Structure formats: C-alpha cells, structure tokens
C-alpha cells in the first residue's frame, strides 16, 4: 500500500464539487493498476487498494465501478479466466459493479475479444450479479492495514527523500499476508483490529496512536514496536499472556490489546495459524472468519451494519486445487446458521456447520486453482 498520497486523503472534494454543480450523486471508478495477470497475486494489491478507496468515499456514493485493466489489449495480455476471477475479487472488496478496459487499443480482431473475453464474462455474469445483489449493504470485515488520514501532512525528514510526501512506504506487508487467509479490510469503519508497521507509526503523532490503542486492538511488527519504544509510547502498555507462538502480548490500562508479531509471510503452516491466533487475540476474538487448516487463499468475510456475518468469499491463490477449506465462522447470530456454498458452473451445496463454543466450523468442497467461490450465510 505504498500508494501515492499526492492526490490527498480521498477524492471527496472533487465528488462534492460535481454534486453541487449538477445536483446528481457522482459515480466512482477507482483504479489501481494491474494490467495483466502474468503475476496473478498482484490483483490482491489492486483489490486492497480498491477497498481503501471505497471505504473513503462519501456514503451517498453507491455506484462504484472499478476499472479492470486489459492494457495492452492483446491476446498475450490478461487471460479470460483471470478477468472473471478479478471481477469477483473486486466485488468482494467493495465494488458494486465493474467497468472494463479490454478493447481500447483494438489490436486483435473484434471476433477474438468476443470469443475470449466476452464469452468468459457472459459465463460468469449471473454468478457475479447474484454475489453483488446478495451482499448489497454489507462491507468487507477484518483487519485494517492502517494508513493515517493525516499522513500527507506529516513532518518529513531527509530520510524520506524528495518525494516522501507522495508515497506512504507503508502497508506492503498486507499483500503476502492476504494470500495466507488473513482477512483484510483497509479503512473499514469498524475493523476487528488495526495493523501498523514502522512507516505508519513514524507518520502518526502520539495522540493519534494512543487514541487508536484505546478504541481498537493493535497489531504491530517488530520494527513498529521499536519505533514506539524510541518515542516512549511502550510505557503505556503492560505485558500479558496470549496464544502460543512467537507473538508478544500487551494490554493498556483501558483494556486495549496489543500484539507484536512478524509480518513475514515465509512461514510454516503451524506458524500461519499461530499468527492468525495472535491477530484474533488482539481483535478480542472478533475476526469474522478464519481459515483453520493450511491454505493459500484470500478470505473476504462481508459483514452487515449490525456486525452479523453476511457471506465469506474465498479466492484460491495457487495453481493447485484445494481439496477443502475448514473455516471458523462468527455469525453474530443466535442459532445454527444456514450456509450455502456457491461456485460458478456448479450447483449450490448446503454446508453443515459444527458448533465450537460461540463459533461455527464448516468445511467446504474443493476449489480449483485460481478460482473463486463463496458461502452465503443466513
């Protein structure tokens, strides 16, 4: 998320001007690069960037159609299947519709675009429409890789370079962790917890950091913790116990939770689950969904305004079929949930959940490599 800050915190001043002059509520078309799927995990970066942009929009802007890039619009570029999976991931991350830049240069015959991109999109259209309609009014839930709204106005030093004001250099840890099933919701209005790295902490004042720790669970990596120590802010927390693993745990006098972990994604399956347990502890055990067994997948729970779980999307981030996913669900409802597995081109499957305390454990069917499916929660 080392995205440019040169345009400010958000685009709302421009949208406000449009609305004043026209009397019409604007539409949003956020972008974030990702021109081909030769390195498909790069769509995670764009999806997380879209989520942040969507969450910063004025609430009356409800038509949000990210641009899916196809530049240079040749047969050697983005794959038809990749285009469809990308569509679903961006819908999961907060888009309400989609726009495509896939013909613009028209290097290929029109029949090629029809037989490839448009034929594939047609096969996924009903699936995408059902997902968007079912999840209307809900938002992605999980952890917020935090970027301060005051970041563009920070005091910059020579260490930041001439363009320090334009780039955050923060949050790059999020992309590899997203592929390990860490549920991320950048700029969520009610995140389960806040994630910080050293660049983010350096650009925040003491008051903002203390206020965050009072109202949210905080997750830090080692370098971020060191910056807090340098500023004397670690004096506001006290060591405590927590789940097994390498994480360190602290609490504030107000009862806030702080977990110090490693953001290194080059870890074992056991370490992945220990990391999620530590993050869940920091959240006060409020993560909406957790993949319990090892999987390299993006997990996107959607939550309603009352905090109840609306759906859980899964995107397989490998080229191998995943035999199944075992997922812990926190539905926010009393009674057993009704769960339905939805997978494009397949019949819906009713899933059986088993109670584990206040949580529910469900195991899904298989999912092909680089594919997308979701669970409707009722």
Model-derived regions: residue spans:
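Glycan-processing catalytic domains of CAZymes
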Residues: 1-214, 222-270, 361
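Surface beta-strand/loop "capping" patches
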Residues: 131-151, 285-320
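Short, exposed beta-strand/loop patches in secreted or surface proteins that constitute
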Residues: 211, 247-252, 299-303, 349-355
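C-terminal beta-strand-rich structural cap/linker in extracellular carbohydrate-active enzymes
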Residues: 217, 356-378
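Catalytic cores of secreted or luminal carbohydrate-active enzymes
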Residues: 259-290
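Generic recognition of long tandem-repeat/solenoid scaffolds
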Residues: 259-261, 310-314, 358-365
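Surface-exposed beta-strand/loop patches in extracellular or lumenal glycoproteins
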Residues: 317-335
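Solvent-exposed beta-strand/loop surfaces of large extracellular or lumenal domains
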Residues: 339-360
């Amino acid at each position: 998320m080392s995205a440019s800050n040169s345009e400010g915190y958000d685009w709302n001043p421009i949208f406000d001007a449009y609305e004043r002059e026209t009397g019409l509520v604007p539409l949003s078309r956020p972008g974030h690069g990702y021109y081909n799927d030769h390195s498909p995990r790069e769509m995670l970066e764009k999806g997380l960037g879209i989520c942040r942009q969507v969450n910063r929009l004025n609430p009356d802007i409800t038509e949000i159609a990210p641009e899916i890039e196809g530049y240079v619009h040749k047969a050697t570029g983005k794959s038809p299947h990749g285009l469809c999976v990308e569509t679903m991931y961006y819908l999961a991350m907060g888009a309400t519709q989609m726009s495509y830049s896939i013909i613009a240069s028209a290097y290929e015959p029109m029949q090629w675009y029809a037989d490839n991109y448009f034929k594939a999109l047609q096969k996924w259209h009903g699936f995408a429409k059902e997902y968007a309609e079912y999840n209307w009014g809900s938002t992605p839930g999980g952890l917020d890789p935090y970027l301060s709204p005051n970041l563009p106005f920070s005091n910059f030093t020579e260490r930041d370079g001439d363009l320090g004001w334009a780039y955050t250099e923060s949050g790059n840890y999020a992309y590899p962790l997203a592929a390990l099933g860490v549920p991320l919701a950048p700029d969520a209005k009610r995140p389960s917890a806040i994630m910080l790295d050293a660049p983010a902490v350096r650009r925040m004042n003491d008051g903002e950091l203390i206020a965050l720790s009072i109202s949210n669970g905080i997750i830090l990596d080692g370098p971020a913790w060191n910056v807090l120590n340098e500023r004397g802010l670690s004096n506001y927390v006290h060591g405590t116990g927590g789940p097994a693993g390498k994480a360190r745990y602290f609490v504030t006098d107000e009862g806030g939770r702080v977990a110090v972990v490693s953001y290194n994604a080059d870890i074992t399956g056991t370490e992945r689950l220990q990391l999620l347990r530590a993050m869940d502890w920091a959240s006060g055990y409020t993560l909406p969904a957790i993949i319990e067994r090892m999987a390299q997948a993006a997990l996107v729970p959607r939550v309603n305004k009352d905090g109840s779980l609306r759906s859980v999307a899964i995107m397989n981030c490998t080229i191998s079929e995943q035999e199944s996913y075992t997922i812990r669900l926190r539905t926010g409802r009393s009674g057993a949930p009704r769960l339905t597995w939805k997978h494009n081109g397949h019949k819906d499957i009713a899933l059986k959940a088993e109670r584990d305390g206040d949580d529910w454990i469900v195991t899904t069917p298989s999912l092909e490599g680089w594919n997308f499916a979701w669970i409707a929660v009722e």
